[in-house]
A protein has these predicted regions:
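Charge-rich, solvent-exposed alpha-helical interaction surfaces
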Residues: 4, 8-12, 16, 33, ...
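Acidic, low-complexity, intrinsically disordered interaction modules
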Residues: 19-85
């Protein structure tokens, strides 16, 4: 898989995580080029944000995203950390 696609997926996931952590006060903006790359290649990411999501191209699973959470509460909640993205080649 191309590195452009991998970077676009990571950018979108980081934006979702920042939005989940900080809500309306999040300062991370997803690049429109990342959204365009995913749309032009028919890449879809499920939107559960619980434990794991899947990445699909035309209905075929190409990878999964496993989310990690902080061990201790910060500001009354467990923050989401950087995800682990594994691709099936």
């Amino acid at each position: 898989m191309e590195t452009k696609i991998k970077k676009a997926i990571l950018d979108i996931v980081k934006g979702r995580i920042d939005r989940a952590n900080y809500g309306m006060c999040s300062k991370y903006f997803v690049c429109t080029s990342s959204l365009d790359i995913c749309e032009s290649n028919n890449i879809h990411i499920t939107k559960k944000l619980e434990y794991k999501d899947t990445i699909t191209i035309n209905g075929v699973v190409i990878g999964e995203i496993r989310y990690r959470y902080a061990e201790h509460k910060r500001n009354g909640m467990y923050k989401m950390l950087a995800p682990i993205i594994s691709y099936i080649d």
